[in-house]
């Protein structure tokens, strides 16, 4: 029984140290992200097409911020009225080998000027590829909530 408890403790410790998440946000100099209220999703995503489900989950996380999702037609109308609109370029990469790792990068551009406004990145490493993705997604979600 004591041996089982020791193995369980060791297994729990191994899981704890084997799961790791990081995230960061970088902003263009002089840009006030608070003035942006809207976001337009387009076809700006790169990476493995097998990861489109993760890209969709990232879009859902962006939708869960204070940003309102609109169409490009509506964006043009709002811009003409002095509103500011963002458009994200989403990149997801999952390493299936070498211990695995998932990286999510969102590059937010001003929809009107195409100026890079902010880059938000996260990464996750866990026990499986799916676990890596969930860790990276949770990390990017938290950073998005902080920024928007």
How should each PLM-predicted stretch be described?
Residues 7, 109, 147:
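Mid-sequence acidic-hydrophobic segments that form the walls
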Residues 30, 34, 38, 43-45, ...:
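Alpha-helical context
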Residues 43-50, 76-90, 135-140:
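Charged, low-complexity, helix/coiled-coil-prone segments
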Residues 53, 57, 101-103, 135:
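Generic recognition of short, well-ordered alpha-helical segments
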Residues 1-8:
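Bacterial N-terminal signal peptides that target proteins for export
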Residues 8-11, 16-67:
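A structural "domain/chain start" motif
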Residues 64-65, 70-131:
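Surface-exposed short loop/turn segments
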Residues 21-33, 61-64, 115-148:
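C-terminal/domain-edge helix-coil "capping" segments
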């Amino acid at each position: 029984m004591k041996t089982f408890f020791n193995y369980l403790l060791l297994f729990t410790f191994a899981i704890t140290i084997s799961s790791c998440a990081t995230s960061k946000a970088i902003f263009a100099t002089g840009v006030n992200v608070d003035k942006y209220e809207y976001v337009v999703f387009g076809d700006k995503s790169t990476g493995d097409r097998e990861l489109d489900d993760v890209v969709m989950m990232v879009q859902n996380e962006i939708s869960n911020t204070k940003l309102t999702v609109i169409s490009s037609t509506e964006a043009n109308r709002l811009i003409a009225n002095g509103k500011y609109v963002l458009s994200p370029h989403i990149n997801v990469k999952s390493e299936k080998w070498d211990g695995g790792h998932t990286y999510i990068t969102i590059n937010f551009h001003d929809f009107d000027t195409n100026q890079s406004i902010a880059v938000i990145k996260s990464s996750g490493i866990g026990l499986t590829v799916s676990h890596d993705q969930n860790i990276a997604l949770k990390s990017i979600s938290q950073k998005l909530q902080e920024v928007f």
